[in-house]
UniProtKB/Swiss-Prot annotation:
NCBIfam families (alphabetical): PRK11653.1
InterPro entries per UniProt: Biofilm_formation_YgiB
Skewed-composition ranges (Low complexity): 178-195
Region (Disordered) location: 178-223
Origin: domain of life: Bacteria
Disulfides per UniProt: none
The family this protein is said to belong to: Belongs to the UPF0441 family.
Coiled coil: none
Biased composition, class Polar residues, residue ranges: 204-223
HAMAP family per record: UPF0441 (MF_01188)
Organism (species): Shigella dysenteriae serotype 1 (strain Sd197)
Name of the protein described by the UniProt record: UPF0441 protein YgiB
Gene encoding the protein: ygiB
Xref: Pfam families: DUF1190
Length: 223
Protein backbone atom coordinates (compact mmCIF):
# COMPACT_ATOMS: atom_id res chain seq x y z
CA UNK A 1 0.00 0.00 0.00
CA UNK A 2 2.79 2.37 0.78
CA UNK A 3 4.27 1.71 -2.63
CA UNK A 4 0.91 2.34 -4.32
CA UNK A 5 0.51 5.66 -2.51
CA UNK A 6 4.00 6.64 -3.58
CA UNK A 7 3.25 5.86 -7.20
CA UNK A 8 -0.02 7.78 -7.09
CA UNK A 9 1.66 10.79 -5.54
CA UNK A 10 4.36 10.79 -8.21
CA UNK A 11 1.75 10.47 -10.95
CA UNK A 12 -0.26 13.32 -9.44
CA UNK A 13 2.79 15.58 -9.28
CA UNK A 14 3.65 14.78 -12.91
CA UNK A 15 0.12 15.45 -14.17
CA UNK A 16 -0.19 18.64 -12.13
CA UNK A 17 3.08 19.94 -13.54
CA UNK A 18 2.02 19.19 -17.11
CA UNK A 19 -1.36 20.85 -16.67
CA UNK A 20 -0.07 23.97 -14.95
CA UNK A 21 3.30 24.59 -16.56
CA UNK A 22 2.27 24.14 -20.18
CA UNK A 23 0.00 27.23 -20.29
CA UNK A 24 2.72 29.28 -18.62
CA UNK A 25 5.27 28.13 -21.18
CA UNK A 26 2.87 28.95 -23.99
CA UNK A 27 2.22 32.39 -22.55
CA UNK A 28 5.94 33.11 -22.30
CA UNK A 29 6.50 31.91 -25.86
CA UNK A 30 3.65 34.13 -27.08
CA UNK A 31 5.16 37.17 -25.37
CA UNK A 32 8.51 36.56 -27.03
CA UNK A 33 6.86 36.05 -30.42
CA UNK A 34 4.94 39.31 -30.09
CA UNK A 35 8.08 41.12 -28.98
CA UNK A 36 9.88 39.75 -32.02
CA UNK A 37 7.11 41.03 -34.30
CA UNK A 38 7.25 44.47 -32.71
CA UNK A 39 11.01 44.69 -33.17
CA UNK A 40 10.81 43.64 -36.83
CA UNK A 41 8.41 46.43 -37.85
CA UNK A 42 8.82 50.19 -38.01
CA UNK A 43 6.33 53.02 -38.42
CA UNK A 44 7.31 55.41 -41.20
CA UNK A 45 5.82 58.48 -42.83
CA UNK A 46 5.77 59.19 -46.55
CA UNK A 47 6.66 62.68 -47.77
CA UNK A 48 7.13 64.26 -51.17
CA UNK A 49 9.80 66.72 -50.05
CA UNK A 50 11.35 68.44 -47.03
CA UNK A 51 8.55 71.03 -46.88
CA UNK A 52 5.92 68.30 -46.45
CA UNK A 53 7.97 66.78 -43.65
CA UNK A 54 8.49 70.14 -41.91
CA UNK A 55 4.78 70.93 -42.06
CA UNK A 56 3.96 67.60 -40.43
CA UNK A 57 6.74 67.92 -37.83
CA UNK A 58 6.88 71.51 -36.50
CA UNK A 59 10.28 72.38 -35.09
CA UNK A 60 12.01 69.57 -37.01
CA UNK A 61 12.83 71.48 -40.18
CA UNK A 62 16.57 70.75 -39.98
CA UNK A 63 16.00 67.01 -39.51
CA UNK A 64 13.50 66.97 -42.38
CA UNK A 65 15.94 68.72 -44.71
CA UNK A 66 18.74 66.34 -43.76
CA UNK A 67 16.54 63.30 -44.36
CA UNK A 68 15.37 64.65 -47.72
CA UNK A 69 18.92 65.38 -48.91
CA UNK A 70 20.10 61.96 -47.76
CA UNK A 71 17.21 60.36 -49.64
CA UNK A 72 18.21 62.25 -52.81
CA UNK A 73 21.78 60.95 -52.49
CA UNK A 74 20.48 57.44 -51.96
CA UNK A 75 18.25 57.80 -55.02
CA UNK A 76 21.25 58.76 -57.15
CA UNK A 77 23.07 55.67 -55.93
CA UNK A 78 20.30 53.08 -56.14
CA UNK A 79 17.71 54.25 -58.70
CA UNK A 80 17.33 52.24 -61.93
CA UNK A 81 19.61 53.67 -64.63
CA UNK A 82 18.88 53.75 -68.36
CA UNK A 83 21.22 54.16 -71.31
CA UNK A 84 18.83 56.58 -73.05
CA UNK A 85 16.28 59.18 -72.02
CA UNK A 86 13.67 57.44 -74.16
CA UNK A 87 13.99 54.20 -72.19
CA UNK A 88 13.55 56.03 -68.89
CA UNK A 89 10.56 58.07 -70.13
CA UNK A 90 8.90 54.93 -71.48
CA UNK A 91 9.03 53.47 -67.97
CA UNK A 92 8.24 56.50 -65.79
CA UNK A 93 6.60 59.09 -68.03
CA UNK A 94 7.49 62.48 -69.47
CA UNK A 95 9.02 64.94 -67.02
CA UNK A 96 10.01 62.26 -64.50
CA UNK A 97 13.53 61.49 -65.75
CA UNK A 98 16.84 63.26 -65.28
CA UNK A 99 20.46 62.78 -66.25
CA UNK A 100 22.23 60.81 -63.55
CA UNK A 101 25.55 61.98 -62.10
CA UNK A 102 28.48 60.00 -63.50
CA UNK A 103 29.42 58.77 -60.03
CA UNK A 104 25.92 57.54 -59.13
CA UNK A 105 26.76 53.91 -58.48
CA UNK A 106 27.50 52.85 -62.05
CA UNK A 107 30.49 50.73 -62.94
CA UNK A 108 33.02 52.58 -65.17
CA UNK A 109 32.43 50.27 -68.16
CA UNK A 110 28.68 50.90 -68.01
CA UNK A 111 29.23 54.64 -67.69
CA UNK A 112 31.30 54.54 -70.87
CA UNK A 113 28.63 52.51 -72.68
CA UNK A 114 25.88 54.94 -71.73
CA UNK A 115 27.97 57.98 -72.60
CA UNK A 116 28.79 56.55 -76.05
CA UNK A 117 25.12 56.00 -76.86
CA UNK A 118 23.61 59.25 -75.56
CA UNK A 119 26.29 61.27 -73.82
CA UNK A 120 24.93 60.29 -70.41
CA UNK A 121 22.60 57.85 -68.67
CA UNK A 122 19.23 58.53 -67.15
CA UNK A 123 17.32 57.83 -63.96
CA UNK A 124 13.84 58.61 -62.59
CA UNK A 125 13.29 61.60 -60.34
CA UNK A 126 12.69 60.79 -56.70
CA UNK A 127 8.90 60.99 -56.26
CA UNK A 128 8.97 60.92 -52.47
CA UNK A 129 10.64 59.23 -49.55
CA UNK A 130 9.93 57.17 -46.47
CA UNK A 131 11.20 58.47 -43.16
CA UNK A 132 11.28 56.84 -39.75
CA UNK A 133 9.60 58.68 -36.91
CA UNK A 134 11.62 61.58 -35.49
CA UNK A 135 11.69 59.87 -32.12
CA UNK A 136 13.58 56.84 -30.90
CA UNK A 137 15.58 57.91 -27.89
CA UNK A 138 18.59 59.22 -29.73
CA UNK A 139 18.72 56.32 -32.18
CA UNK A 140 18.25 58.74 -35.06
CA UNK A 141 16.13 58.04 -38.10
CA UNK A 142 16.41 56.52 -41.55
CA UNK A 143 15.04 57.43 -44.95
CA UNK A 144 14.37 55.56 -48.18
CA UNK A 145 13.81 57.15 -51.62
CA UNK A 146 10.63 56.26 -53.49
CA UNK A 147 9.85 56.33 -57.21
CA UNK A 148 6.60 56.41 -59.17
CA UNK A 149 5.47 56.15 -62.79
CA UNK A 150 2.97 58.25 -64.75
CA UNK A 151 2.80 55.68 -67.53
CA UNK A 152 -0.49 53.74 -67.22
CA UNK A 153 1.17 50.74 -68.87
CA UNK A 154 3.79 50.44 -66.12
CA UNK A 155 3.22 48.23 -63.04
CA UNK A 156 4.63 51.18 -61.06
CA UNK A 157 1.88 53.51 -62.30
CA UNK A 158 0.50 55.66 -59.49
CA UNK A 159 2.41 53.72 -56.84
CA UNK A 160 5.33 54.40 -54.54
CA UNK A 161 8.09 51.86 -55.07
CA UNK A 162 11.62 51.60 -53.74
CA UNK A 163 14.73 50.98 -55.83
CA UNK A 164 14.19 47.20 -55.74
CA UNK A 165 10.65 47.53 -57.10
CA UNK A 166 8.83 46.84 -53.83
CA UNK A 167 5.41 48.50 -53.78
CA UNK A 168 4.29 50.71 -50.89
CA UNK A 169 0.83 51.62 -52.12
CA UNK A 170 -0.58 54.72 -53.76
CA UNK A 171 1.80 57.59 -54.48
CA UNK A 172 0.14 59.86 -51.94
CA UNK A 173 2.45 61.75 -49.55
CA UNK A 174 1.41 62.38 -45.97
CA UNK A 175 0.56 58.76 -45.22
CA UNK A 176 1.90 56.79 -42.27
CA UNK A 177 2.38 53.05 -42.50
CA UNK A 178 4.11 50.12 -40.84
CA UNK A 179 6.90 48.42 -42.78
CA UNK A 180 9.52 45.77 -41.98
CA UNK A 181 12.76 47.27 -40.69
CA UNK A 182 14.45 45.76 -43.75
CA UNK A 183 12.48 48.23 -45.89
CA UNK A 184 14.60 51.06 -44.49
CA UNK A 185 17.92 49.29 -45.01
CA UNK A 186 20.23 50.77 -47.69
CA UNK A 187 19.68 49.19 -51.11
CA UNK A 188 22.50 47.93 -53.36
CA UNK A 189 24.02 50.47 -55.71
CA UNK A 190 22.92 50.25 -59.33
CA UNK A 191 25.88 49.00 -61.33
CA UNK A 192 24.27 48.23 -64.71
CA UNK A 193 21.73 49.89 -66.97
CA UNK A 194 18.16 48.58 -67.09
CA UNK A 195 16.46 47.70 -70.35
CA UNK A 196 13.18 49.38 -71.25
CA UNK A 197 10.42 47.89 -69.10
CA UNK A 198 12.90 46.10 -66.86
CA UNK A 199 12.05 48.03 -63.71
CA UNK A 200 8.34 47.49 -64.32
CA UNK A 201 8.98 43.76 -64.44
CA UNK A 202 10.72 44.00 -61.06
CA UNK A 203 7.71 45.84 -59.62
CA UNK A 204 5.33 43.19 -60.98
CA UNK A 205 7.42 40.36 -59.51
CA UNK A 206 7.70 42.08 -56.13
CA UNK A 207 3.93 42.68 -56.06
CA UNK A 208 3.29 38.99 -56.76
CA UNK A 209 5.66 38.00 -53.96
CA UNK A 210 4.01 40.46 -51.55
CA UNK A 211 0.51 39.11 -52.34
CA UNK A 212 1.75 35.55 -51.90
CA UNK A 213 3.38 36.37 -48.55
CA UNK A 214 0.22 38.14 -47.34
CA UNK A 215 -1.94 35.17 -48.30
CA UNK A 216 0.36 32.71 -46.55
CA UNK A 217 0.39 34.85 -43.41
CA UNK A 218 -3.42 35.11 -43.39
CA UNK A 219 -3.85 31.36 -43.77
CA UNK A 220 -1.38 30.70 -40.96
CA UNK A 221 -3.15 33.05 -38.57
CA UNK A 222 -6.51 31.60 -39.50
CA UNK A 223 -5.32 28.09 -38.67
Amino acid sequence: MKRTKSIRHASFRKNWSARHLTPVALAVATVFMLAGCEKSDETVSLYQNADDCSAANPGKSAECTTAYNNALKEAERTAPKYATREDCVAEFGEGLCQQAPAKAGMAPENQAQAQQSSGSFWMPLMAGYMMGRLMGGGAGFAQQPLFSSKNPASPAYGKYTDATGKNYGAAQPGRTMTVPKTAMAPKPATTTTVTRGGFGESVAKQSTMQRSATGTSSRSMGG
